[in-house]
Amino acid sequence: MPLRRSRSDAFDDLVVESAIRLQRRWTGQLGAVEFRVEDVPPGEDGGGIALGSCHSAVGDQPARVTVYRRPVETRAVSENARATLVHDVVVEQVAALLGLEPETVDPDYGLD
C-alpha cells in the first residue's frame, strides 16, 4: 500500500523544485544558497505577514532563502495556485538576495 505524502512534504517538494529550477539558471550565484521551509515567519514586520525571507551569507553561515508554509497555504486557493505562489515567493526572495528584479531571475515570473 503506497504511503500518502503529507501536505508539509508536498510543500517542501515545491520549494525544492523551484530552487532547482533557479539554480540551473543561476548556478554561480545560487550554488551555496540554502533553501528552507519554516511553518511561520518569526514575527510581524509591520507590513503584514511575510511569505518568505532571504538573508545574505555572514561568516560561515550561507545565504538562505526561507518560504513560510502556513501563510502561503492560507493564501493559495488551490494546489495549482499554491505551486505558483511558492515559485513566485522563491523567485522574489532570490531576486532580493541577488539585487535583481524577479523578472530577471525568472522571465516567467508572474505570468501564471
Language-model features: where?
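Polyanion-binding surfaces on beta-sheet-dominated domains and ring/shell assemblies
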Residues: 10
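Active-site beta-strand/loop microenvironment that shapes enzyme catalytic pockets
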Residues: 90
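Active-site scaffold of zinc-dependent metalloenzymes
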Residues: 51-87, 97-112
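A short, surface-exposed helix-loop junction/capping segment
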Residues: 1-6
